[in-house]
Amino acid sequence: MMTPIGIRIRKQIPLSYHYSSIQALLSRFTPTPYNPISNSSSSTQTIPTQFHESQCTNPISRPTVFLFDPPPIRFTHTKSFSTDPSSLDFPSNQPPVVSTISSHHNISQPIDAGSSIRKPISLWPGMFNSPVTNALWEARSNMFEKYGEPTADPPSQSELVTKSPAQSRTSILYNLSSDYALREHYRNPWNMIRIGKLLEDLDALAGTIAFKHCTNEDGMSRPLLLVTASVDKMVLKKPISIDTDLSIVGAVTWVGRSSMEIQLQVLQTTHESSDPSDSVSLVANFTFVARDSKTGKSAVINQISPETGEEKLLWREADERNKMRKMKRKIQKDLELEKQYIERLNALLAEGRVFCDLPALADRNSILMKDTCLENSFICQPQQRNIYGRIFGGFLMRRAVELAFSTTYSFAGVVTHFLEVDHVDFLRPVDVGDFLRLKSCVLYTELQNPTEPLINVEVVAHVTRPELRSSEVSNKFYFTFSVGPEAVKDGLLVRNVVPATEEEARRVLERMDAETPHPHSQYENEI
C-alpha cells in the first residue's frame, strides 16, 4: 500500500505566474502514476501529490480524473485512487471534474501528472483545454493503460461484439454552483455560459463514448482511429445558467458498418419545474467514423443492440437521420439542374445585382453578404492537439462559434445570443503546424418574426499551405443567432442579407434546403 504524501496548499496561484518559477517547480516534481478507481472501496486510498510551501509559494492545481460506478456522487477536492494494479476496471460512467486553478473557495487541490513520464508545463491538462475535456482524455488514456501496449503487428478486430447503449453511457457533472474556479472557466463577459467551451466538451465526451463502444477487452485488437465526421443540428431549448449545476449524458444510439451516432443531452435542473424533460437544455447528435490506425482504411466496429423502448426509438430516429444524410448527398447535384432551382437562384441574385449596378438605389435595409464577413488566421499549436496528435475537433468548434458570434455582434450592433448549431462537417483532419484560416459571413437572415429575427452564419475553415500555394477546406460550420426582445423593442432593425454572386446564392440555397426535410429515399448504402 502506498502512503499519502504532501501537505495542504494554502496559497492561490497568481495569474502572473512566471515560467522560470514553473521550471523550478518542475525540477522538484516527480509525477506519480495512478490507476482508475476500483469497485471495491477497501482497495483504494488517497494519494494527493502536493508541494511544501517551502518549495514553491505558488502551487498549481489541475483537474484529476476520478472514475467510479453509478449512481453519480458529487466530488470533493481530494478523492481516492486505486493503487492495486489488479483492480483496474473499465472506466466508469461519470468522471467528475474539478477546477484547474485554486481559488479562495478551494483550500487545496491534488496535483497529478497522469503519467510516469514527466510532461512539460505546456502539456499539463487544464492549461489549454477545459477541465472536462482533460478529464475525458485522461479517462481514455486509462483505457489504453489497462490493456497495455499492443504487439508489434496486432491482428485486426475480427471478432466483433454486440453491445447495448447502456454499456457506452457516460455522464459528466459540472459543480458550477459550488466551484468558483470551474465557473470562471465557462463564464463569458455577459455572465452567461460560454457555448464554445460547451461544444468543446461535447466533442470530447462523444469521442470517449465512441471509444468505449469500440473497445474490446481482448487486449489484442488494433486501436482504432475514431474521428468526428459531422454534427447534426443542436438547438438550445432554454438558456443555460452559469451558477447552477450542469450535467452532460450521452450514449451510442446507432451503429452502421464503420460509423456510429452518439446522442448527448445537456441537463440543468431548475427549481421552477420537477418534470425531468424540462431539464434538457440541449440535444446533440455526433457522427463518428472508425479508421484502422495502421492502414487508414475504414474499420468495422462493434454493433449495437437496443434493449429498452427508449433505446429502440432513438435507434430508429438515428437510422432515419442516417438515410436522410445519404439521400441529400445523392440528390444535391440533381436539384441544381431543376428549373425551379434556377428560378430561386435568379430571385436571390436580383437584389444583389441592384447593389452592384445601381448602388444609390439599393434597399437601405439590405446589405451584401460580402460586407458581413470576418476572418481569423492562426497557426495550430501542439497544445491544441487531441490524444491522436491532431488538432482537437472541439477546439475548432469553439473557435468557429466564437468567430460566428463576433460576426453577428458586428452585424447587428448588439450582443446576440446563440440559438443552435445547424450543422458541422469535418471534411479533412487538421494537423499541428497547419496555417488555419476561419472565414465567416452572415448567409441570410429570417425576418418573418419581427420579435425574434434570426441570423444564420457560415464559418468555413481553410488549411492553407503557402509553400505549396494550396488551400483546402477542412471544416464547415453553420450557426443561428438572434437578438434579444429588448433590442427589438428599442427599435433595432436587423438588415436583410443578399448575395452578389452565383456562388454566394448557391451557398444560401444549399443551407436553406438543408433545413427543409425531403421525402424518404431507398438509398441505404453504409458509410
From Swiss-Prot:
UniProt keyword Cytoplasm present: no
Q: Annotated Gene Ontology MF terms?
A: fatty acyl-CoA hydrolase activity
Q: Which UniProt keywords apply?
A: Hydrolase, Mitochondrion, Repeat, Transit peptide
Q: Transit peptide boundaries, per UniProt?
A: 1-75
UniProt tissue specificity: Mostly expressed at low levels in glandular trichomes (lupulin glands), and, to a lower extent, in stems, leaves, flowers and cones.
Q: Which residues form the HotDog ACOT-type domain?
A: 172-294, 370-487
Cellular localization per UniProt: Mitochondrion
Specify the superkingdom: Eukaryota
- Family classification: Belongs to the acyl coenzyme A hydrolase family.
Q: What does this protein do?
A: Acyl-CoA thioesterases are a group of enzymes that catalyze the hydrolysis of acyl-CoAs to the free fatty acid and coenzyme A (CoASH), providing the potential to regulate intracellular levels of acyl-CoAs, free fatty acids and CoASH. Active on acyl CoAs with short chains (propanoyl-CoA and butanoyl-CoA), branched short chains (2-methylpropanoyl-CoA, 2-methylbutanoyl-CoA and 3-methylbutanoyl-CoA) and medium chains (octanoyl-CoA).
Task: Return the PANTHER family for the record.
Answer: ACYL-COA THIOESTERASE (PTHR12655), ACYL-COENZYME A THIOESTERASE 9, MITOCHONDRIAL-LIKE ISOFORM X1 (PTHR12655:SF3)
InterPro entries documented for this protein: HOTDOG_ACOT (IPR033120), HotDog_dom_sf (IPR029069)
Uppermost EC category: hydrolase
Q: What is its EC number?
A: 3.1.2.-
A Gene Ontology annotation in the biological process aspect, one of them, is: acyl-CoA metabolic process
* Name of the protein described by the UniProt record: Acyl-coenzyme A thioesterase 4, mitochondrial
Name the principal localization, coarsely classed: mitochondrion
Q: Which GO terms describe its cellular component?
A: mitochondrion
Biological source species: Humulus lupulus (European hop)
Keyword Cell inner membrane, does the record have it? no
Q: Which reaction does it catalyse?
A: 2-methylpropanoyl-CoA + H2O = 2-methylpropanoate + CoA + H(+); propanoyl-CoA + H2O = propanoate + CoA + H(+); octanoyl-CoA + H2O = octanoate + CoA + H(+); butanoyl-CoA + H2O = butanoate + CoA + H(+)
